[in-house]
Each structure stands twice: as structure tokens, then as C-alpha cells.
Amino acid sequence: MREIKTEIQIAAPPEKIWSIITDFNNWKSWNPIVTQVSGSSSLGSELSVTMCGKDGKAAQKYKPKITNFEAPKSFRWRAKMMAEFLFTNDKTIELEKVGSGTRLIHKEFFSGMMVPLMWGFLDKGVPPMLKSMNDALKAKAEKS
């Protein structure tokens, strides 16, 4: 299993950030990477997710399942390509209260037989996407 991890400090309480990140239907209003998410923000729910490509057009659609949901601390979803043993991606967002603000820890885990073949792309391409998403979330949470 390979992991990519990013962190950001946000000057807003975890509860406020939680309300933004679990309002999946409004991700498109602030998220430059994940342009559409539909589904219920609850344990076991299957979501429909569309990610944006470099050209700003829809690049990838997938259907992750929420495998962990601990309000207002963390959630995790899992998506697989064809079969789990080929390629699985887990996204985890954790919120830690730090003073009057929050540390957001954003992780992506990759496993399966395809990961060694894709790692060069994942290791270079995913961190900037996570940073862009984190920065946009910070701006939204600190603005309102």
C-alpha cells in the first residue's frame, strides 16, 4: 500500500469544516478538483464522484463507498477499479482541533497490482490536486 498525505491549518472550528466537507452536493461550489459528488454522507453510502481534468473538463467518474464516518472527526471512502486486487483508492479526511482552529489531514491510500505501474503518475499528480482542494476548502471555511 502506498500513501500520499497532505495537511493544512484552517482558522475555523472542526464542526464548520465538517459541515462543508459532508455537504457533498455543494462540493462543486468550492472544490476545483472534485466537481461533483452525489449521495448521502453516511456510513455505507455509495457516492457518485466526478473529478476534473487539467483542461477543466470531467476526467474521471467513480463510485466510492463510505467506509468510515465519525462526525465531526473523519471520514473515509473506498473506490476500486474493476476489482479490488487490481487497484483500490481510499480517501481519508481527518479533522483535529488545534486551539480555535483545525488541522486538516488529507490522505490517499493506493493498493493493488496496478499501483507499481501507476505510482510515478500518482506520486507526482496527486499531491498538487490535494493541495488545491485543501486550499479551496480553507478559503471557503475561513471566508464565511
Residue ranges: model-predicted function:
Residues V37-L47:
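A solvent-exposed, acidic/Ser-Thr-rich amphipathic alpha-helical stretch
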